Amino acid sequence: MKHFLSMISTAGMAALFLLSGCGKQAAPKAPVFVKDDVGIVRRVNPDEKNVYLVFTAHYSENDSGYFENFDGVVPVLNTLKEKGVKGSFFPTGVCFVQPQYQEPIRRIIDEGHYLSAHSYAHLVLCEDGRTLVSADSLARDFALMEVQLERFGLEKKQYYWLIPPYESCNIESRENMEALGYKLLNPSEGPIFDLDWTTPDMKAYKTIDQMLERLWELEESEGLNGIILLIHAMNYPEKQDIERPYNHLGEIIDTLQARGYGFRTFKDVIAAE
């Protein structure tokens, strides 16, 4: 009898717990965004110690991928898999049609990363504040991009966070992309891995050591909470493997984790919206 009453009491308490709402699983907190003057997201949840690793690429068809390509994707995927970390990938639509990238793109999806794009043809949207691509031309380019994403089984609700081509756009271009149903992000200001294409004869040239030093200086001075950290998944010519930032991805992940950072993707952002 005591056992029976105990069962009733326990069941009753559980029922009251659920009815009171205490047993409900907490809904994800709506993301907080830090935007630049153009209105593009540059950091996500700056109060949380997470980093958003993003990887972009384009395939230059005029030189069969000599200068721009997606050849870094497999080493990036292998490192992320080894470290148990997820990333967000934004190749241009042109990358999706190259035979050599079919399997890596499928891996991006199958291994749980976020996949979107970077326009189809890597359009230069603006220059010196002037819009260079009309809304109609942009819509045609994005329609081609969407065909490729959906060829891999994705729906727009899964890939609507997008990086503008060349990580550059003005307010008009942003509004045109938003009218097509997209939300925009760009790499956070500070890190300089996007200069990995430069060579020693260029004024903007930075060595890989300088790029890494800049990242750790930024972490120590400002912190990297919510940072969108861009690394090109490309093999630029006239570069040795040690000079390619993605070949230092494992070191970057290890150091960030040792300093208490976690990693998130734009899948997490969509889930919380």
How would you describe each model-predicted region?
Residues 27-114, 121-127, 144-159, 252-255:
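Active-site beta->alpha N-cap acidic-glycine motif
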Residues 1-11:
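Bacterial N-terminal signal peptides that target proteins for export
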Residues 24:
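Short, conserved catalytic or interaction motifs in soluble domains
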Residues 97-103, 122-230, 234-262, 268-271:
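Catalytic domains of cell-wall/extracellular-matrix polysaccharide-remodeling enzymes
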